[in-house]
Amino acid sequence: MESLPRTPTKGRSTQHLSTPSPKNDILAMNGHKRRNTTTPPPKHTLLKPQRTDIHRHSLASQSRISMSPNRELLKNYKGTANLIYGNQKSNSGVTSFYKENVNELNRTQAILFEKKATLDLLKDELTETKEKINAVNLKFETLREEKIKIEQQLNLKNNELISIKEEFLSKKQFMNEGHEIHLKQLAASNKKELKQMENEYKTKIEKLKFMKIKQFENERASLLDKIEEVRNKITMNPSTLQEMLNDVEQKHMLEKEEWLTEYQSQWKKDIELNNKHMQEIESIKKEIENTLKPELAEKKKLLTEKRNAYEAIKVKVKEKEEETTRLRDEVALKQKTNLETLEKIKELEEYIKDTELGMKELNEILIKEETVRRTLHNELQELRGNIRVYCRIRPALKNLENSDTSLINVNEFDDNSGVQSMEVTKIQNTAQVHEFKFDKIFDQQDTNVDVFKEVGQLVQSSLDGYNVCIFAYGQTGSGKTFTMLNPGDGIIPSTISHIFNWINKLKTKGWDYKVNCEFIEIYNENIVDLLRSDNNNKEDTSIGLKHEIRHDQETKTTTITNVTSCKLESEEMVEIILKKANKLRSTASTASNEHSSRSHSIFIIHLSGSNAKTGAHSYGTLNLVDLAGSERINVSQVVGDRLRETQNINKSLSCLGDVIHALGQPDSTKRHIPFRNSKLTYLLQYSLTGDSKTLMFVNISPSSSHINETLNSLRFASKVNSTRLVSRK
């Protein structure tokens, strides 16, 4: 037991009493200005009667303690101390009361300092962790860029060396061989053609002359021999010779006649042949004069040009040889540079190996950091509140609503309190101003992209394995469906895009996800499958197949029997699914809206993740709920089927408010929660309890004509916003 300070008496000196002087303490406290969160409290602010263990707690937390949250306690303390000081001598009971309050105040101060120190430590750890992750990512990107740059430089140098070698060889071969061969071929062909033609004609002429001369010589020799033989015979035997002469003469005459006849015919033939040959010779001469000589002149001219070109080529070859010499020197220099580059490459390869080892270690660290990130992200979301309420004000409809929206005033976000406030003015007999506070308020100029920047954190929680509910609440025509389902930037399309982007990022850390979805509506407390195959029929024709809600107590998961489940593999599939579901959703015309949604639509996304590297598993469910319009019956002016629809809608919305209110009670873990009062709350039972996260969008109209419905929606949202979930096992 802690000993109480003794009461001062007249016989004792007050210097030795354990009770501090209230006046001195109050003066000491007033003498200190307000400190920031990092300034430790002065020792004399902790009053002397507290125990030493409490004093140690306060000293350990000195670097992170703020006195600002204790103003009211200090004011109470001052008032109590002044009261006690004024009546100390006359009222010993008041002195005892003061002592008890001093101890309680010290205890409260110590606890408060300890809590704030813990909070600051957690914030510092979170900041350090983020800085480490950023530094690791920066180092990794720098190393990767250096590696790519070095590889590109090496490839460029190799390509330059290869191109220089190929160009050198091709130039040398082409210049040295091609031109020489071509010149030799031209000269040889010209000489060969001229020589061949000249030889052919000479041969023909000489052959003709030789044949004629030979023929005439042979005939003359033959005749001379015969004459000589006859002369010899005449000399030897005149008679015989005479006879023989006669015979010979007779025979000679015959032969002469035959020869003359033959000679004449042969002579005629020879003359004709000679004339023919002369004509051929003349034609050949003409051809030589007319054709071959000009060709020869052209060939000579071409030969001269080729010789000149050859000389020019020789000059170029000489220049190329000089250039080749220069290139050889450059190649030698390049080879030297390449050797140096190869040495650098070896060094870089070793560096890359070391870097790869470091990267492997970094990957392992990143995998661990992902687990830490999930934990810190969840703690951050819990600090912001497991139940959050955002308000969204849609723009006024042109030509349909009053453009004066001054009845609603939105204030700036308060960083100190972490909330944003708004005032709504209702003018009846007098102006009544109603103030509401929410976690975030989106004004008329804010877009769906701005909205999803806040929603994306909760979508991330579903990927981390938590159940998440996002509601769009408000009167008909307030923009709920636009917020949830607008193509391209609505919460549902943006959520799918966010999920697939993060799935691709997490693949590098070993995570593999399977994404399945269901799309249902709750119409008159009946579940309707919006993804059924008979999409031409507006009614759910699966008669005999009841849609029942079943809960698994062990795994804390919920299933709906006989509904269509689709495996999502791309963002494009979601567009098709949403178009199909919108065609089948129940809508009708009311006094508030021509196309009023008469049911609650729920887009359920199941996210099952596993990590092959760490063996970790996660399973989260994301419920995106577009609630039906929340207007009153006397405003919507409905009858018949529309009246029954409105009654069921208002009943389920009321049950949702009752469930959330019951979950926020201190004894909610022991008391009964009325989940079964509506199909909506029963379906979302495990997404509203435990570590689940809930976000409600209250959508309102800025028009003064809807001020009553706007106030009703804001009051309901304020009731939800005041709830703080208690974890239920």
From Swiss-Prot:
Q: Which residues form the Kinesin motor domain?
A: 386-723
Q: Any additional notes?
A: KAR3 contains two globular domains separated by an alpha-helical coiled coil. The N-terminal portion of KAR3 contains a microtubule association domain distinct from the kinesin-like C-terminal domain. Present with 3250 molecules/cell in log phase SD medium.
Membership in a protein family: Belongs to the TRAFAC class myosin-kinesin ATPase superfamily. Kinesin family. NCD subfamily.
Please give the residue ranges the record annotates as the region Globular: 1-109
Q: Which Gene3D superfamilies match?
A: Kinesin motor domain (3.40.850.10)
The protein's Enzyme Commission number? 5.6.1.4
Keywords from the UniProt entry: ATP-binding, Cell cycle, Cell division, Chromosome, Coiled coil, Cytoplasm, Cytoskeleton, Isomerase, Karyogamy, Microtubule, Motor protein, Nucleotide-binding, Nucleus
Pfam families per UniProt: Kinesin
Q: Which consequence is recorded for altering N650K?
A: Increases strength of microtubule binding. Prevents release of ADP upon microtubule-binding
Name the record gives this protein: Kinesin-like protein KAR3
Provide ranges: composition bias, Polar residues: 10-22
Effect after changing R632A: Decreases microtubule-activated ATPase activity
Please cite one Gene Ontology biological process associated with this protein: nuclear migration involved in conjugation with cellular fusion
Classification via CDD domains: KISc_C_terminal (cd01366)
Which spans of this chain does the record mark as coiled coil? 110-357
An MF annotation (GO) of this entry: ATP hydrolysis activity
Name the reported effect of G479E.
Answer: Poisons nuclear fusion
Q: Which GO terms describe its cellular component?
A: chromosome; cytoplasmic microtubule; microtubule; microtubule cytoskeleton; nucleus; spindle pole; spindle pole body
The upper taxonomy is:
Eukaryota, Fungi, Dikarya, Ascomycota, Saccharomycotina
Write out the residues that bind ATP. Answer: N386, R388, R392, E454, G477, S478, G479, K480, T481, F482, E554, K579, T694
Q: What is the catalytic activity of this protein? A: ATP + H2O = ADP + phosphate + H(+); ATP + H2O + a kinesin associated with a microtubule at position (n) = ADP + phosphate + a kinesin associated with a microtubule at position (n-1, toward the minus end)
Mutant lacking the gene: phenotype: Short mitotic metaphase spindles with splayed microtubules (MTs) increasing spindle width. Disrupts the poleward movement of kinetochores on MTs; abolishes poleward sliding along the lateral side of MTs and increases end-on pulling. During karyogamy, (the mating step where nuclei fuse), abolishes the formation of a MT bridge between the two nuclei thereby leading to a failure in nuclear fusion. Abnormal meiosis I; cells do not progress past prophase I, interhomolog recombination is abnormal and the organization of MTs is abnormal.
Primary role? Minus end-directed microtubule (MT) motor involved in spindle midzone assembly, poleward transport of newly captured kinetochores along the lateral side of MTs, karyogamy (nuclear fusion) during mating, and with an essential function in meiosis I. Functions together with the accessory proteins CIK1 or VIK1. Drives the poleward transport of newly captured kinetochores along the lateral side of MTs, both during S-phase and during M-phase.
InterPro entries in the cross-refs:
Kinesin-like_fam, Kinesin_motor_CS, Kinesin_motor_dom, Kinesin_motor_dom_sf, P-loop_NTPase
